């Protein structure tokens, strides 16, 4: 017999550690190459080539950008609140990455006779024969999204710059406006699945139609509101270059600036992963390929959609942004909840 800890073999713990590392590396590589993919996709949509110089067809461009930012000078404004200025990028970046702890990437795998779910915050219960995960996974993700905006607001305030402060204030107002609508949009999913567990929501979609077909309005509203919440075009008012130089990032340079950049793209990947889990059946797909492949394919399709939207739509004015959130999306989500409640009760 091999060495055991708490009645479980070392292979089990090694597999758990490897699972965390694989998810982290996957997210990190996706974030890095999402920047490259966006530049190439938008370039081709505008009849350009995009990055071409660094590596074959510019494939090494993310590495070149990372090296450049790493060696750039770290500048801190003389009148900035230095502690808050330095901690703000971390507050924005960390929640963007740890949200993946509750997202199921696929079915269980077997290691040393033990089944291990492809989800960080989950384990396989041999007594019930089911995967046990965080039963409020969706609330966990919504809470992390709320924490992330504190980093942006803190960056705007601590920089002691008018442009940065306006960007931070815009971000907080935008997050409040659209997180409310996004949260209400997915209540209809909870009503259908009768659970906040992401494993249960995915399992329910395996036995019938995806919730994107059962709840098309909720799917569209949640995806659009989530794009607005992470400040992606056409909702990128907090860092509007034509108005605020670079918004809350104006005074940042070097790796601190890169951390905000990574947080934006990590949030985009998180939003696409959550949308896949809630509305597109998670990892379920034709059985000739493993579940994790279908999950990644769906996530990448939604990431491409985000980039397509950026290349297609111009930026909203701020009054249009607020009007859309409060006078259009919020009433539509409430109407959808009422209609879903009536249908479920019949």
Swiss-Prot record:
GO terms for biological process: aerobic respiration. It is found in: Cell inner membrane. The chain crosses the membrane at residues 14-34, 83-103, 136-156, 172-192, 208-228, 260-280, 289-309, 324-344. It catalyses: a quinone + NADH + 5 H(+)(in) = a quinol + NAD(+) + 4 H(+)(out). Its EC number is 7.1.1.-. GO terms for cellular component: plasma membrane. InterPro entries: NADH_UbQ_OxRdtase_su1/FPO, NADH_UbQ_OxRdtase_su1_CS. It is a multi-pass membrane protein. Keywords: Cell inner membrane, Cell membrane, Membrane, NAD, Quinone, Translocase, Transmembrane, Transmembrane helix, Ubiquinone. Pfam families: NADHdh. PROSITE patterns: COMPLEX1_ND1_1, COMPLEX1_ND1_2. NDH-1 shuttles electrons from NADH, via FMN and iron-sulfur (Fe-S) centers, to quinones in the respiratory chain. The immediate electron acceptor for the enzyme in this species is believed to be ubiquinone. Couples the redox reaction to proton translocation (for every two electrons transferred, four hydrogen ions are translocated across the cytoplasmic membrane), and thus conserves the redox energy in a proton gradient. This subunit may bind ubiquinone. Belongs to the complex I subunit 1 family. This is NADH-quinone oxidoreductase subunit H 2. It comes from Geobacter metallireducens (strain ATCC 53774 / DSM 7210 / GS-15). The lineage of its organism: Bacteria, Pseudomonadati, Thermodesulfobacteriota, Desulfuromonadia, Geobacterales.
């Amino acid at each position: 017999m091999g060495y055991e800890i708490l009645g479980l073999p070392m292979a089990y713990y090694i597999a758990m550690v490897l699972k965390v590392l694989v998810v982290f590396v996957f997210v990190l590589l996706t974030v890095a190459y999402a920047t490259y993919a966006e530049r190439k996709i938008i370039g081709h949509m505008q009849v350009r080539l995009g990055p071409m110089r660094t590596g074959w067809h510019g494939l090494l461009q993310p590495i070149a950008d990372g090296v450049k930012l790493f060696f750039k000078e770290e500048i801190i404004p003389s009148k900035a609140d230095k502690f808050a200025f330095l901690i703000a990028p971390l507050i924005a970046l960390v929640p963007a990455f740890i949200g993946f702890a509750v997202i199921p990437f696929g079915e269980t795998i077997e290691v040393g006779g033990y089944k291990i779910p492809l989800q960080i915050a989950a384990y396989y219960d041999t007594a019930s024969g089911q995967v046990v995960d965080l039963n409020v996974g969706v609330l966990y993700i919504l809470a992390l999204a709320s924490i992330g905006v504190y980093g942006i607001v803190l960056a705007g305030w601590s920089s002691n710059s008018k442009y940065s402060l306006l960007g931070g204030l815009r971000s907080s107002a935008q997050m409040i406006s659209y997180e409310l609508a996004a949260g209400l949009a997915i209540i209809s999913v909870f009503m259908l699945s009768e659970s906040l567990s992401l494993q249960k929501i995915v399992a329910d979609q395996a036995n019938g139609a995806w919730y994107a077909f059962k709840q098309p309005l909720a799917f569209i509203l949640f995806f659009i509101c989530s794009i607005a919440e992470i400040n992606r075009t056409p909702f990128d008012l907090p860092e509007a270059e034509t108005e605020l130089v670079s918004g809350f990032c104006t005074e940042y340079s070097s790796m601190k600036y890169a951390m905000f950049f990574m947080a934006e793209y990590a949030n985009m990947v998180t939003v696409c992963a959550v949308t896949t889990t809630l509305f597109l059946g998670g990892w379920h797909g034709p059985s000739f390929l493993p579940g994790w492949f279908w999950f990644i394919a769906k996530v990448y399709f939604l990431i491409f959609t985000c980039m397509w939207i950026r290349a297609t739509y111009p930026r909203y004015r701020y009054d249009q942004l607020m009007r859309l959130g409060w006078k259009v999306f919020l009433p539509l989500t409430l109407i959808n909840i009422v209609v879903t409640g009536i249908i479920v009760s019949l």
